[in-house]
């Protein structure tokens, strides 16, 4: 068995919309399966900044237009983005494995992060989510 390889994919590397993400995960899956084919155990972690931002904007817009839908908390938007990024990666990897006649299990796992609301980092955020906008 080869080495365990951990791959970190930034959310920006996955595109700025769903069609771009589908292209990115297909290309990424080929490289990942190359590593698996070489005998490595592969673990993938991914970012979700642009994706969670798009979901947050969509959910906020829905809430403004239909008050029966409350604004989704960031934890829910994060889980939604992890789920759809994860399933797209999982499906692309599984398809690439299938094309190569390789029987390897692939799983998506959602994660949770606990933060201290009093953390000094909240005073000067450095990690944006969603679209960038110019100050007016």
Identify what each model region corresponds to:
Residues 53-54, 119:
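Generic domain-boundary/flexible-linker signal
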Residues 62-136:
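Ligand-binding beta-strand-loop-alpha-helix segment within the catalytic cores
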């Amino acid at each position: 068995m080869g080495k365990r390889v951990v791959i970190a994919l930034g959310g920006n590397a996955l595109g700025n919309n769903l069609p771009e993400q589908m292209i990115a995960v297909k290309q990424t899956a080929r490289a990942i399966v190359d590593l698996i084919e070489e005998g490595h155990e592969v673990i993938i972690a991914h970012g979700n900044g642009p994706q969670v931002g798009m979901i947050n904007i969509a959910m906020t817009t829905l809430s403004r237009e239909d008050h029966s839908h409350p604004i989704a908390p960031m934890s829910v938007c994060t889980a939604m983005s992890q789920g759809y990024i994860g399933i797209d990666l999982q499906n692309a990897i599984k398809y690439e494995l299938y094309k190569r006649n390789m029987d390897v299990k692939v799983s998506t796992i959602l994660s949770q992060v606990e933060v201290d609301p009093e953390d000094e980092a909240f005073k000067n955020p450095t990690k944006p989510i969603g679209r960038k906008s110019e100050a007016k």
